[in-house]
């Protein structure tokens, strides 16, 4: 299902010239970068404790303790679900990208989706060769201790997509 979602997003992206027949360029890119499962959906929240309580008390979900991600300017909390996770994001520090998001969306909302890939460096190289915009093509260590990059929303139909190495 998520491979189809990404295929549809990439097919509709202005950054690609596409062939919708079998063996399409987009299908080949997806295969080349080794997209795996949906790792998490990230939600920016203006009130971290309130959001933690919501998922714990209303849905009975396992909720982690908050962790400050100094390098990324966010505090993260992971909500464990049966087949994926929700990452709650709250601003941390003076230069938090989440602060800007919350200025535009004061009550919070979906910030990004995260998909797993086999090899982050190979995925970056392949996507750059196909003119997909990557916010910073140098992988950084993400909240799970694994390398990540973010694909620019302008290349992904308005969706910020995080790729995380399996």
UniProtKB/Swiss-Prot annotation:
GO function terms (MF aspect): metal ion binding; methylmalonyl-CoA epimerase activity
Domain VOC: residue ranges: 37-166
InterPro entries: Glyas_Bleomycin-R_OHBP_Dase, MeMalonyl-CoA_epimerase, MMCE/EMCE_epimerase, VOC
Enzyme Commission (EC) number: 5.1.99.1
Record's subcellular location: Mitochondrion
Family affiliation: Belongs to the methylmalonyl-CoA epimerase family.
Listed name of the protein: Methylmalonyl-CoA epimerase, mitochondrial
Organism of derivation: Dictyostelium discoideum (Social amoeba)
Lineage, uppermost ranks: Eukaryota, Amoebozoa, Evosea, Eumycetozoa, Dictyostelia
Gene: mcee
């Amino acid at each position: 299902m998520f491979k189809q979602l990404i295929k549809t997003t990439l097919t509709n992206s202005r950054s690609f010239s596409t062939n919708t027949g079998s063996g399409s360029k987009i299908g080949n890119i997806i295969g080349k970068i080794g997209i795996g499962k949906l790792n998490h959906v990230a939600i920016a929240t203006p009130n971290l404790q309130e959001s933690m309580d919501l998922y714990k008390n209303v849905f009975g979900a396992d909720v982690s303790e908050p962790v400050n991600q100094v390098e990324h300017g966010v505090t993260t909390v992971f909500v464990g679900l049966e087949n994926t996770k929700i990452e709650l994001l709250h601003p941390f520090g003076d230069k938090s990208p989440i602060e800007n998001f919350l200025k535009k969306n004061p009550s919070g909302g979906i910030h990004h989706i995260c998909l797993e890939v086999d090899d982050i460096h190979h995925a970056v190289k392949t996507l750059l060769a196909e003119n997909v915009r990557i916010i910073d093509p140098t992988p950084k260590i993400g909240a799970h201790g694994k390398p990540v990059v973010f694909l620019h929303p302008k290349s992904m139909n308005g969706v910020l997509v995080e790729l995380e190495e399996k």
